[in-house]
């Protein structure tokens, strides 16, 4: 289910999708603590939800990007770079936490050894670049558990920044539907896609 918020601090749960269940522990912790989140992993994903995902990637204060060993992750590894760039472009008060499993699952590796070899090489390359060049608002973590702890620390840091500065991030306080409608060319605007309940 996609969770949306129109104000406050939101954690974007990007990264490995498919049949992956890594988000479950995060969602349970966030709901217990009252932390807002965006979960792009839905059963009935439709192309029009891409705009909602893009909005959250550009606006959520904390972006999580785990690349697990459950897939070869060619697309996810490329999206990792985009996530880091988006955090830099849209403001220094945004944070990205990245976890890249250095290997692929054994069963997956046996199914296509060449793709697994390429994936492991790409994972090492992306990790090396991130560790060497990551800006101060990008955190490379070593496990999903570390990512959850880091995300909660980052939410607390965002809350402190908001209290200290006041909520001057007016752009973030408006809904994805508002921005999709406001940015649509005049005369061609279709209603913004409804978010699943």
Regions found by a protein language model. Name each.
Residues 1-197:
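Conserved catalytic or regulatory cores that recognize and/or transform ribose-phosphate-containing ligands
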